[in-house]
Regions:
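Long, C-terminal-biased catalytic regions of enzyme "large/alpha" subunits
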Residues: 1-198
Length: 198
């Protein structure tokens, strides 16, 4: 990019665009035009494409396997990139979240990442951790929220392609994930989770 910037006198940017609705729209049009084309998911699924250079949504349950691959790819972009850690239910507490963030920040060069739990809302009882379709307290139907790309929306409002992606999504299992690379030596706030009072 810097060569082109120098040659043409313009600024260029390499970005992993989110493509919220086009991942489905383009895959649907491509499937219609070329019935045998490969799209994300399994045969018979509603067609969709995986966002930018993200891994297939069902690639692994080990967050560090995914981070190892994405760390090499996403650092090539000059902006507009993010790694979403889809966690299903929330982490047990803020200390677990702080520990995971510290581990990622200490061992990876990724510029942006999110911890993205799924949660549900009951009109009567409020917040419920994870995907809970029926409130355990009153039996009412809930609204399930998850990150569609850069923001949260009720899953019921997603387009068919994003719904298929959500159905195929494998959530990272933090308890059964293991860091395989040697720990990098970086300056961090020592024992952050233990020292901070809430």
């Amino acid at each position: 990019l810097s060569d082109y910037q120098e040659q043409y006198g313009d600024l260029y940017n390499l970005e992993a665009t989110p493509a919220e609705s086009t991942t489905y729209r383009l895959a649907k049009h491509d499937r219609k035009r070329w019935p045998g084309i490969k799209t994300a998911g399994k045969p018979g699924d509603t067609p969709y494409y995986t966002n930018s250079s993200h891994l297939p949504v069902d690639y692994t349950v080990d967050i560090f396997d995914a981070l190892d691959i994405q760390d090499e790819l996403q650092t090539l972009y000059t902006s507009g990139t993010v790694f979403h850690a889809f966690l299903g239910e929330k982490l047990p507490d803020w200390k677990a979240a702080a520990s995971l963030v510290r581990t990622i920040a200490s061992n990876y060069k990724l510029p942006y990442y999110t911890l993205s739990p799924t949660y549900s809302i009951c009109k009567e009882h409020g917040y419920l951790a994870g995907e809970v379709k029926v409130c355990p307290h009153c039996g009412a139907k809930t609204e399930v929220y998850s990150r569609i790309t850069g923001y949260y929306r009720p899953v019921q409002n997603w387009n068919d392609g994003k719904l298929q992606e959500y159905a195929n999504r494998t959530e990272y299992d933090i308890d059964h994930s293991s860091l395989k690379r040697p720990t990098r030596s970086v300056v961090t706030l020592s024992n952050f989770a233990e020292d901070v009072e809430v």
